[in-house]
């Protein structure tokens, strides 16, 4: 079997490309950062931030006949910069492909470079790639979605469509784009590994959709009642975009907003050109959704989208408040609470202050940790420990009129749900 190297194969789009290649009989090698873990079967170690020269790609390219680059970041953070991820590393890879006669398929993005650094850097590499003496195909998709999952902005749009009673619609919702199913994009990429004239191909469905129509179709597919919309005023939308840009988090940033405002449309005749060149028809959204009925899990994912941050930040505030209370409560009050129990001989004031510091650290950790699951697990352990220890030493806490320690019975499964939901990949 011929071997394909997929860069970004563990991402949303890359995963579908890996699957499509395997369906067509390819042996697939996926570039992956180890992060201290054992590599899975078919993975090869690599880090785009360190593979900035052609010779750095020699091992990954051994026995490879085609490369598919689906790597990308929507915003810069720390060492993750557009220039390195979108330009320098893939250009070094492409230069290494020249001497080995390896074909190159680039997953770029449809848009205007003036929309922001994400688009500008993608298109800058596209031009550099096509200037090299190698067989190169550049695919520029519009908004990419899948009924089998979502990520980033498509998750947000699906959640807006599924909002209880009425969908939430940014502004008037009349912005036009041509969404493409991830499975169709993956099939085009897989075919492009062996055929197609070098050049740039815009990828999108045949008929442009407005944002309102896009969300309405998703709502019908999810079988959520209500056809009306609550229109979110543009100033509020712009404020949310500004906040997301400033925080460096969330599915929306200034580039995505600019792309939406400008409209994300393919060039004339692009749909027909893609079908003629690769033999793949990029389906309209309605056709894709009609092919597969929604399931309960699809509705859960859409309806839980806004509940996840609500749950997360409620837990953050609860832990920070608990920490503050543990640090500022008068020592006499703490000693009075412990009087007559086993805690009286265990320096209860010191225990309360220590627990307060721990709660503050856990609350801050959940708020800012890039990988929050270990923090949530620590919270689970601490709540279970509090319930067991204080339940044994101060059993009267379970009998307080307002619940007191008894509320930990509900808090434990809530933290278990949060542990599952905070992992967005």
What are these model-derived regions, one by one?
Residues 14-16, 87, 123:
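Residues forming the Rossmann-fold NAD(P)(H) cofactor-binding site
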Residues 191-254, 266-308:
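Mid/C-terminal beta-alpha module of Rossmann-like enzyme folds, strongest
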Residues 88-92, 125, 181-184, 362, ...:
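Conserved cofactor-binding/catalytic machinery of classical short-chain dehydrogenase/reductase
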Residues 36-92, 96-98, 110-113:
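NAD(P)H-binding glycine-rich loop region in Rossmannoid oxidoreductase-like domains
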């Amino acid at each position: 079997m011929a071997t394909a190297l997929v860069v970004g194969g563990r991402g949303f789009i890359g995963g579908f490309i890996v699957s499509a290649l395997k369906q067509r009989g390819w042996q697939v090698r996926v570039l992956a950062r180890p992060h201290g873990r054992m590599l899975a079967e078919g993975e090869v170690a690599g880090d785009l931030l360190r593979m900035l020269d052609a010779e750095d790609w020699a091992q990954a390219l051994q026995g490879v006949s085609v490369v598919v680059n689906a790597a990308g970041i929507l915003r810069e953070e720390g060492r993750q910069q557009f220039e390195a991820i979108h330009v320098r590393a893939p250009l070094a890879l492409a230069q290494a492909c020249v001497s080995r006669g390896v074909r190159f398929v680039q997953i770029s993005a449809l848009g205007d470079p003036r929309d922001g650094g994400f688009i500008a850097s993608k298109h800058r590499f596209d031009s550099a790639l096509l200037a090299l003496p190698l067989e190169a195909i550049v695919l520029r998709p519009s908004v990419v979605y899948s009924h089998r999952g979502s990520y980033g902005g498509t998750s947000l749009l699906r959640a807006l469509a599924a909002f209880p009673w009425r969908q939430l619609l940014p502004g008037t919702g009349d912005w036009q784009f041509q969404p493409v199913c991830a499975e169709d994009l993956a099939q085009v990429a897989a075919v492009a590994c062996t055929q197609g004239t070098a050049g740039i191909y815009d990828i999108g469905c045949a008929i442009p959709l407005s944002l309102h129509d896009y969300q309405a179709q998703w709502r019908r597919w999810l079988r959520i009642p209500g056809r009306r919309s609550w229109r979110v005023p543009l100033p509020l939308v712009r404020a949310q975009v500004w906040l997301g840009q400033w925080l460096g988090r969330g599915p929306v940033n200034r580039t995505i907003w600019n792309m939406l405002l400008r409209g994300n449309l393919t060039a004339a005749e692009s749909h027909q050109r893609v079908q003629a060149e690769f033999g793949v028809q990029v389906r309209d959204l309605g056709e894709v959704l009609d092919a597969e009925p929604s399931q309960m899990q699809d509705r859960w994912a859409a309806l839980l989208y806004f509940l996840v941050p609500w749950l997360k930040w409620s837990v953050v505030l609860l832990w920070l408040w608990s920490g503050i209370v543990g640090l500022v409560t008068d020592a006499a009050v703490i000693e009075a609470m412990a009087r007559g129990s086993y805690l009286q001989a265990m320096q209860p004031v010191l225990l309360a202050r220590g627990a307060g510091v721990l709660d503050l650290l856990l609350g801050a950790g959940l708020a800012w940790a890039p990988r929050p699951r270990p923090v949530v697990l620590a919270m689970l352990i601490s709540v279970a420990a509090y319930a067991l220890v204080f339940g044994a030493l101060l059993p009267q806490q379970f009998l307080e009129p307002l619940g007191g320690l008894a509320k930990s019975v509900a808090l434990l499964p809530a933290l278990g749900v949060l542990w599952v939901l905070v992992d967005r990949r």
